[in-house]
Amino acid sequence: PMTKVLNAADISKALNAFEAPGSFDHKKFFQLVGLKGKTHEQVKKVFNIL
């Protein structure tokens, strides 16, 4: 599951930040969800899950 790599609270925070249609910002999303601080392998694992 995604929560083995990312914090569940961070995932919720990121999803809530972009609820409005057209508000998605991938750079901000990656920052909020905690991907910016992850290793290449951890990021790869997240995208494999998606």
From Swiss-Prot:
One of its GO terms (cellular component) is cytoplasm. InterPro entries: Parvalbumin. Disulfide bonds: none annotated. One of its GO terms (molecular function) is calcium ion binding. Residues 38-50 form the EF-hand domain. Keywords: Calcium, Metal-binding, Muscle protein, Repeat. Gene3D superfamilies: EF-hand. It comes from the Eukaryota. Belongs to the parvalbumin family. Probably regulates the activity of the caudal neurosecretory system. Binds two calcium ions. PANTHER family: PARVALBUMIN ALPHA. This is Parvalbumin.
